[in-house]
Amino acid sequence: MQAVEEIRALSKRLNSSIVKTVGLTQSISDVCRNMKQFNDIDVTLNIDETTIDKLTQEQQLVVFRIIQEQSNNIIKYSRASATTISLTEKNNQCCLIISDNGIGFDKAKQKPSGIGFINIFNRIDAYNGKVEINTFPDNGCTLNITIPYIL
């Protein structure tokens, strides 16, 4: 088990430099390709490059980390066969939407309190952004995230 944790830590360090080196779009595309190749989850990807251009390097890394985290949640818990990742601009803010067609959950009974969700909320909080989770049992899960641009 320790070896797995060490590999994950190494992977995160490498991915940080990958976003800087190959860019956010390619980094996200790699996550999507892995979801399909290793987990047979169809991914629809919608990225507006002008939105990415308005994000700082740090914000781009935050977006990438959130996509990684939610992709892991989808793989581990959702039993989804398809997911959509959309990165666009809305109301002069970055808008990230990640949705799946999985089993969803009842937020009233099962609060999103895992370390993955906590990390997502903390990352967005640091940029005065907002996270909204829309989910119902047997109806998938959608994360709606907004991040203000830094001027």
Q: Where on the chain are the PLM-derived regions?
A:
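Coiled-coil dimerization/phosphotransfer module
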Residues: 1-151
